[in-house]
Amino acid sequence: MVETTQHFVSIESSNRPDPANTTPANYSIQLPQRYRNIWSAMLVNIALPAVSPPQKYVYLDIDKLNSIDSTSPSGGVNFALAKIPLSIAGTGNVFFADTMTSSFPNVPLQNPVATMDKLNIKLKDANGNVLTIPAGNEHSFMIQLTCGDYIPRGGGSTITQNGRVLGGTR
């Protein structure tokens, strides 16, 4: 029987290690532990201030966890982890989304991530341009990581037509 573990990770953009040389819309942050054999990632919630230029949608891009494809000319495969609809573009209101409304599906990654100890985060528009969040307006969000069994000497998993199979070449 396959066992999975759910991890919920809270991220605050104000905790980025080098705020003087990064922005709240494009940064890297260390995770509290190394996560192994990540099968899926899902945005649980987000509090997001107004962005510049004003947008109807903001795309959350987290390197290695993206599973949403885009049809925009500069989009492509694995463009974003989540598409976040902003209720009123350009307002100073904080937008909060919650997956209890099934806004953000939990989509399995085509190729599970063997290990991850850092997140590379970008907030983008539909064309892939990194947005601007005014100085001092930080954001906060939570993601859920679903991790499979950690198997020494051959962990990882593979998605086949009949489901997910433990083991593999990683």
Curated annotation (Swiss-Prot):
Q: Which residues are glycosylated?
A: N21, N93, N129, N137
Q: What induces it?
A: Expressed in the late phase of the viral replicative cycle.
Source organism, top-level taxon:
Viruses
Q: Where is this region: Disordered?
A: 1-25
Q: Where are the transmembrane segments?
A: none
Write the protein's name: Penton capsid protein P1
Q: What is the lineage of its organism?
A: Viruses, Varidnaviria, Bamfordvirae, Nucleocytoviricota, Megaviricetes
UniProt-annotated location(s): Virion
Role according to the record: Constitutes the 12 pentameric capsomers positioned at the 5-fold vertices of the outer capsid shell. One of the vertex is composed of a variant of P1 (type II pentameric capsomer) and has thereby a structure slightly different from the other verteces (type I pentameric capsomers).
Which keywords are on file for this protein? Answer: Capsid protein, Glycoprotein, Late protein, Virion
Write out the GO cellular component annotations.
viral capsid
User: What is the name of the gene encoding this protein?
Assistant: A310L
Regarding how it is modified after translation, the entry says: Glycosylated. The pattern of glycosylation sites are unusual.
